[in-house]
């Protein structure tokens, strides 16, 4: 897995921020029902973000990410991937995600992202919507730029870039991406090599996709974790870049 059970996002809460949150169940166009966690400001949001977790699905780490976004005036919804194979129950620490990830296909994930985007637009009032993913979710965040969702940008932390489980990855589908890309990568990531990252950047450039690929020297996979104190400065910079990307691509 990407993060330990006691991991958390290295983002300090904003004291006094008025944020509402709730567990919700969303339904995709194909009829799939899946769990999600919605958070947002008590005032109209400046934009919306679909938060895409790692391979564990909807976990408290990503609920916290949604809350931190809400404190920034952003409507956020973190989604689970496994409604089709495991129902809408909460994912505990003993959830056998390794049984379900191989059954999770890109088309299904994109259908679920579409439902989350619609929720942010119709229920939360966010006209401009982004995706933000981590690891497994980073990959699907970038792919969502080819999903026909009309998103304003796709952000991914240490996502895989090539083929996986017989399906094309962001490199192979770079020509289909229709939104700016932000990639935040670890220079010491053993799962996603420097060659993988370079190939992704080359593919984006060749396809004419607006992009920024940032590699943090010495940072491991899943560096964005408050337990990883050695990467505190890296994580702070990455979070600043996330917020700056949202600002840069939100009209007005």
Language-model features: where?
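N-terminal cap/leader regions of alpha/beta-hydrolase-fold enzymes
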Residues: 1-252
């Amino acid at each position: 897995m990407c993060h330990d059970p006691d991991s958390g996002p290295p983002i300090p809460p904003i004291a006094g921020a008025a944020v509402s949150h709730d567990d919700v169940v969303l339904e995709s166009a194909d009829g799939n029902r899946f769990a999600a966690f919605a958070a947002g400001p008590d005032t109209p949001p400046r934009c919306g973000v679909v938060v895409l977790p790692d391979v564990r699905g909807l976990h408290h780490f990503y609920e916290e990410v949604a809350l931190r976004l809400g404190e920034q005036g952003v409507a956020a919804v973190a989604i689970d991937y496994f409604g089709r194979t495991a129902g809408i129950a909460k994912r505990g620490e003993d959830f056998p995600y390794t049984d379900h990830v191989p059954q999770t296909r890109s088309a299904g994930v994109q259908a679920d992202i579409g439902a989350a985007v619609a929720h942010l637009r119709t229920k939360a009032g966010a006209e401009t919507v982004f995706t933000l993913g981590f690891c497994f979710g980073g990959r699907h965040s970038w792919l969502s730029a080819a999903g026909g969702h009309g998103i304003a940008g796709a952000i991914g932390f240490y996502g895989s870039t090539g083929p996986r489980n017989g399906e094309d990855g962001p490199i192979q589908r770079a020509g289909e991406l229709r939104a700016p890309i932000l990639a935040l990568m670890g220079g010491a990531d053993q799962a996603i090599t420097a060659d993988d990252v370079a190939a992704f950047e080359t593919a984006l450039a060749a396809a004419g996709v607006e992009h920024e690929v940032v590699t943090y020297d010495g940072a491991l996979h899943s560096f964005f974790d408050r337990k990883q104190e050695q990467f505190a400065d890296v994580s702070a910079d990455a979070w600043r870049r996330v917020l700056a990307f949202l600002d840069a691509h939100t009209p007005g």
